[in-house]
Amino acid sequence: MSNPTPWWQNGVIYQIYPKSFQDSTGNGYGDLAGVTRRLDYLQELGVDAIWLTPVYVSPQVDNGYDVADYCAIDPAYGTMADFEQLVAAAHRRGIRIVMDMVFNHTSTEHPWFKAAQDRHSPYRQFYVWRDGEGDTPPNNWRSKFGGNAWQWHADSGQYYLHLFATEQADLNWEHPPVREELKKVCQFWADKGVDGLRLDVINLVSKQQDFPSDSQGDGRRFYTDGPRIHEFLQEMSRDVFQPRGLMTVGEMSSTTLEHCQQYAAQSGEELSMTFNFHHLKVDYAGGEKWTRAAPDYVELKQIFRHWQQGMHNRAWNALFWCNHDQPRIVSRFGDEGALRVPAAKMLAMVLHGMQGTPYIYQGEEIGMTNPHFSSISDYRDVESHNMFIERAAQGQSPDELLAILASKSRDNSRTPMPWHAGENGGFSDGEPWIGLGDNYQEINVEAALADPDSVFYAYQQLITLRKTLPLLTWGDYEDLLPEHPSLWCYRRQWQGQTLVVAANLSRELQAWQPA
């Protein structure tokens, strides 16, 4: 610890989904100028950086995670000048900028993919093309969004791989020019003043090259934490991340502790830190997302203990409850009624008391809930619509499917940020691209700032505490009640200091006396 502590090891990062944050033009879509307009609010909260989900040119099949040009701002979000103004305004306030890099796949509208449709083009090798057997795809891998992961391309007579939507073609990282082009993208944004990168599903980029069918699952074991993934990340880090001083956080799908100990090792050879999602599957009945089940809090505590202890003094965790793909945490593990405020504070305290870099997703700091949509037409998310169509065709009732979506859809976190109780919550002067939550007149920023006992000020205090209490950055982790079904009590210790966090996940009073 003789070296200065990197800013992100005692900092807090705020995730912004720009489309739903603040509209500055009245067209119903949030934009970069809207983010700039709200920087004073973020400065008051006390965050060290903002992470922007993709604002690049995109057909918006998957809300910007289908990138058609990595180095251009989509006109829906504004201009490059708007982006440059945002960076400058944020930096003046001591707020850093983290950009989202979607490097597993591009949009099929990307110039690389358009060129790759010609078998003789040098860009053909930028993507994963394979022959099938007659009408049968190359293997039985499933797309994360439903259906087969291979799409037949009639003009060139081969299938291309898409682990996500059909319009999101997987890049071929085995081909060195692909990696060189992606390094150029990182350099471009570093030149624009970006301070960090969030790498979308980055542990899926190395595929087993014989592409075997999976007799036991959906194929993920053949491309998750794949054979060359550490080599690829070390190359990116050596050539771009380290020379440019970029903080990097990898989104790791279905990963393991052992891999993350290497991805985010303190030596810094690959990434600064990693996201994993195991803790957000404790309400998946039988491991299946599209179900309704009560969370298993004993399992939740076990997962955090495993990662807190396994990464301690070896590697770095990214801590989060919410993001643009997850339902609101106060609806999921807390309470939407009379106990919403204490539940939101409790969940914040538990997470911010751990070792790692906490991430706050927009609206989490005011205790936003799921929106309670009542019709499939209220939803915009491609994954949600695909699930509804697929399951309805299998005979599940629309009411049952809507109940599942109300608890698990990605759109639960994508409703507009409510700034006040007036029209459209102050998000837009026009019709918002997606509906607001039904309780925005009660739960909004103006109301939170006016109430000294609000969730906002609890988050503000936790952010301040992380900067002033080194124990939070460096202390160990001991679960004091690992088998208790509703009490989450843990102890952190460092250099003679002790911190005990005690939280009640139930709606009933519980008694506990620390030893």
Where are these regions (language model features)?
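Active-site and adjacent substrate-binding regions of carbohydrate-active enzymes
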Residues: 1-514
